[in-house]
């Protein structure tokens, strides 16, 4: 595994938003599929719920979970998230720090559309920004 998809990348793919093509390219690599954080499950559900589409969550999440590896939240990631938040000079939500830290401790590239991840120093995280 070389990439971890942030929730923003999963949502871009699911809703065919800008950056979806880059996520699709990563998902096509059957030998080395990307991962997602277990936190992405609740963020994806929250997005569907906010759009009034909560009922489709189970089937859609199952479909996503079949093509990615789901990474658990570990104590090492929690510690790294604290280090990352301390190093950021700008606001970085805790949930995003935990997702970034999961990629960081696994030494894989975080794929995202959230500009606020760019406050994370390169010594902590490899990033692929798929936003506009």
Task: Give a label for each model feature.
Residues 1-36, 48-62:
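Short, well-structured N-terminal submotif of metal-dependent ribonuclease cores
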Residues 3, 31-35, 66-71, 109-111:
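Short loop->beta-strand "edge-of-pocket" segments that line small-molecule binding or catalytic clefts
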Residues 5-6, 36-37, 92-93, 114, ...:
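Histidine- and aromatic-rich ligand-binding microenvironments
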Residues 10-11, 41, 78, 117-118:
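A generic structural signal for short hydrophobic patches within well-formed alpha-helices
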Residues 45, 62-65, 82:
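Amphipathic alpha-helical segments within well-ordered protein domains
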Residues 51-55, 88, 127-131:
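Short, hinge-like loop/turn segments at secondary-structure boundaries
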Residues 69-113:
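Active-site neighborhoods of divalent-metal-dependent phosphate/nucleic-acid chemistry enzymes
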Residues 100, 104-132:
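Acidic, PIN/NYN-like endoribonuclease modules and their adjacent C-terminal/linker elements
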């Amino acid at each position: 595994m070389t990439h971890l998809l942030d929730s923003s990348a999963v949502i871009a793919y699911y809703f065919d938003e800008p950056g979806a093509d880059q996520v699709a390219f990563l998902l096509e690599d059957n030998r080395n599929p990307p991962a997602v954080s277990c936190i992405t499950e609740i963020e994806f559900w929250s997005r569907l719920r906010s759009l009034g589409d909560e009922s489709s969550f189970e089937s859609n999440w199952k479909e996503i979970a079949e093509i990615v590896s789901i990474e658990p939240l570990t104590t090492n990631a929690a510690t790294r998230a604290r280090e990352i938040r301390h190093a950021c000079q700008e606001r970085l939500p805790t949930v995003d720090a935990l997702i970034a830290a999961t990629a960081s401790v696994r030494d894989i590239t975080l794929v995202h559309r959230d500009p606020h991840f760019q406050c994370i120093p390169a010594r902590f995280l490899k990033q692929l920004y798929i936003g506009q």
